[in-house]
Amino acid sequence: KDVKEQYGEILTKIGSMGFSAMMHGYMPFDEEDNLLVPFRTWRNNITEQATDVLTPLFGQQIPQRWSIAHLYQAILNGEDHVKDLAFFTTLAGYIHWRMTGEKVLGVGDASGMFPIDPKTKQYDAVMMDKFEDLIADRHFAWHLADILPEIRLAGESAGSLTAEGAKLLDPSGELEAGIPIAPPEGDAGTGMAATNSVKQRTGNVSAGTSVFAMVVLDKELTKYYP
């Protein structure tokens, strides 16, 4: 609509597109794709109890904003919705899912849901096992690996715009389905790409709702620092 009004052109096709949004937070869904609780954003710092357990358990800093912290806090709170979990994701992951039908996430955004193994570029399997052991006595029907989004790397296929997604973007129906869509990413990874700060020993600073630095290390940290 904006293109049509400003330039007099009807937009029907785009070479490719992608979605970026705030990282972290918690959007849980059941088997029928119903949102189980209102979106808990990265600013909902309500997970101190969870992070006090997860950080030493994983041997890695787990900030309160991370999705796994929100999930475990909901478990500690005894929240009824947890038993009905079928999938949880970030805001970018949700929008991408609505546009493509694919429950995937770019590796950068995924790293704010659960720690990533830099060798496999997948969720850290050892830490996932530790989490499963931690909640084993709760006897949930789900396993963590089954409810997290699948990870996609830059350049990998992450789906294409469906007819339903095209209608959401353009209610006029002029935008065509089939447009390839990149893996959804978070604001931090988007800033890294925008500033060409993706090589080892480079970094960038982002300033907006919060101020943070993204630094690409040349090796893993040997320990976490409280």
What are these regions, as identified by a protein language model?
Residues 2-226:
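Glycine-rich phosphate-binding/catalytic subdomain of phosphoryl-transfer
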